[in-house]
């Protein structure tokens, strides 16, 4: 009986410690997401090295795939010197889950508006009618710091949401 109580105590304490670490890690990842948005809103990506790995990949909403920190920084900066130079990004929601203790996936809904007319003639979005985007971000913990390893951003098309088959999926 004593062994059962000791084992149960260790499991309970271990679970509490993991929960505390998990909350701390979620907070650290959320802070890195804020850093990404800070770069966007300041239109300066000199700080990209503070929240990405050297091998970070980014796939943007039109399928451009930037491989490594150098390409990611360069491409983001080019667009923020041109069509996004006055755009604004706002984080709306974040869902984080851990794949391992050192790998996490974050799904971020963020809204973007402002900027210049796009190359195809599309006028900039307004705060009342922003682009609604959903990003999938993969973070890895390196030397105690959470860094973006890969990200992909897609536009959410509100008109298509009614056709999501999951909305008709049986509940049981």
Residue ranges and their predicted role:
Residues 17-50, 54, 167-172:
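Short, low-complexity N-terminal intrinsically disordered segments enriched in polar/charged residues
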Residues 52, 62, 108-112, 152-153:
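A mature extracytoplasmic/lumenal domain signature
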Residues 57-70, 80-85:
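A short gly/proline-enriched turn/hairpin at secondary-structure junctions
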Residues 89, 131-132:
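Membrane-spanning beta-strands of outer-membrane beta-barrel proteins
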């Amino acid at each position: 009986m004593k062994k059962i109580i000791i084992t149960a105590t260790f499991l309970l304490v271990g679970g509490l410690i993991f929960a505390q670490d998990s909350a701390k890690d979620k907070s650290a990842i959320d802070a890195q997401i804020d850093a990404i948005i800070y770069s966007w809103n300041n239109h300066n990506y000199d700080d990209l090295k503070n929240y990405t790995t050297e091998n970070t990949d980014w796939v943007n909403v039109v399928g451009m795939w930037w491989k490594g920190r150098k390409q990611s920084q360069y491409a983001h900066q080019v667009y923020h010197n041109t069509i996004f130079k006055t755009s604004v990004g706002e984080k709306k929601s974040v869902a984080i889950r851990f794949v391992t203790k050192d790998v996490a996936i974050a799904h971020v809904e963020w809204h973007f508006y402002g900027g210049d007319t796009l190359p195809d003639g599309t006028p900039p979005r307004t705060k009342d009618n922003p682009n609604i985007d959903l990003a999938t971000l993969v973070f890895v913990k390196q030397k105690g710091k959470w860094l973006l390893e890969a990200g992909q951003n897609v536009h959410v098309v509100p008109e298509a949401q009614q056709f999501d088959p999951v909305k008709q999926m049986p509940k049981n």
